[in-house]
Swiss-Prot record:
E.C. numbers: 2.1.2.9
Organism: Pseudothermotoga lettingae (strain ATCC BAA-301 / DSM 14385 / NBRC 107922 / TMO)
Single Gene Ontology MF annotation: methionyl-tRNA formyltransferase activity
UniProt keywords, alphabetically: Protein biosynthesis, Transferase
Protein name: Methionyl-tRNA formyltransferase
Matches recorded under CDD domains: FMT_core_Met-tRNA-FMT_N, Met_tRNA_FMT_C
Binding site for (6S)-5,6,7,8-tetrahydrofolate: 103-106
Length: 302
């Protein structure tokens, strides 16, 4: 089958790479336009565009620019494209468009399912392959695979596991798409994972230890959970809840060792392994202590 691939970030490019490695015929790619990045604001290709150009695959920035009458794709594969597909385009491909989504639909429809699942402390999530319709992430399911979430999972580790699962079910599906039955979603069970806002990144140490831990791991390593320290915005990485009792104001550093900073919450203590100060690289709390950048009894603002 001739495949039209729609996707933008590294998450999507790894799925495209799997299709190419399996020998599938990708006749075109739709990806978001180049964006300015870095201090020099140099225009940068998306990871999907980079991979497509490397493999001499035609690249387009929107479906309206794609020559459907000349390239005639049989099926569309969508992975983290970053835009909705209008009905007039849905009808232009014989077999339709199929989307890989990192949640067990109908749960966590929307832009940030991995972050939101971790933030909510989910113990089970997964990957869904479904047929696109006009409504957001609401089309019938083709395949799903469950993925358990352990207490040490971070965004990075869970995303990597999601990618591996997504690559497998996508390649399994494309071996014989006609053999799979579609199953309608139970829309009454739908929940949503809205796009991350800057306010979502901030840690509130007045919450319980589990909530604080989940907030930090949901954005580890990118874009990084935030808090204020002596009026500066800092990022926090790696968190484990260890105690259910303490004394002291939430956000107070009560101890620092090679495991990290022991910080009070509303109901206990959480160990945070790394900190990143503005214009600095990530470092251990012990390094920050030795560099006199912080000390025991300092407090993060909530």
């Amino acid at each position: 089958m001739k495949i039209l691939f729609l996707g933008t970030p590294l998450y999507a490019s790894r799925h495209l790479e799997a299709l190419l490695s399996a020998g599938h015929m990708v006749i075109g790619v739709i990806t978001q336009p180049d964006k300015p990045a870095g201090r020099g604001l140099r225009m940068v290709h998306s990871p999907v565009k980079d991979l497509a150009l490397k493999n001499k695959i035609p690249v387009f920035e929107s479906l309206k620019d794609f020559p459907f009458d000349r390239l005639t794709p049989d099926i569309g594969i969508v992975v983290a494209y970053g835009g909705l597909i209008k009905k007039k385009f849905l009808d232009l491909i014989p077999f339709g468009y199929y989307n890989i989504h990192p949640s067990l639909l109908p749960k966590y429809r929307g832009a940030a399912p991995i972050n939101r699942a971790l933030e909510n402390g989910e113990k089970m999530t997964g990957v869904s392959l479904f047929k696109l319709t006009e409504k957001l992430d609401a089309g019938p399911i083709v395949l799903q695979v469950e993925i358990s979430v352990d207490c040490f999972e971070t965004f990075d580790s869970l995303e990597n596991r999601m990618i591996e699962a997504g690559k497998k079910i996508l390649c399994d599906f494309l071996k014989n798409p006609e053999s799979f039955e579609l199953r309608e979603q139970d829309h009454s069970q739908a929940s949503y994972a809205p796009k991350i806002t800057p306010a979502d990144l901030f840690v509130d140490f007045r919450k319980d230890s589990e909530a604080v831990k989940n907030k930090i791991r949901a954005y580890d390593s990118r874009p990084g959970a935030r808090t204020f320290f002596h009026g500066e915005q800092v990022k926090l990485f790696g968190a484990v809840a260890i105690e259910k009792c303490h004394s002291g104001e939430p956000g107070t550093i009560v101890h620092i060792d090679d495991k990290g900073a022991y910080v009070t919450t509303s109901d206990g203590i959480i160990v945070i392994s790394q900190i990143q100060f503005p214009s600095k690289k990530k470092m251990s709390f012990l390094s920050a202590l030795n560099g006199r950048m912080l000390r025991v009894k300092d407090r993060f603002q909530s």
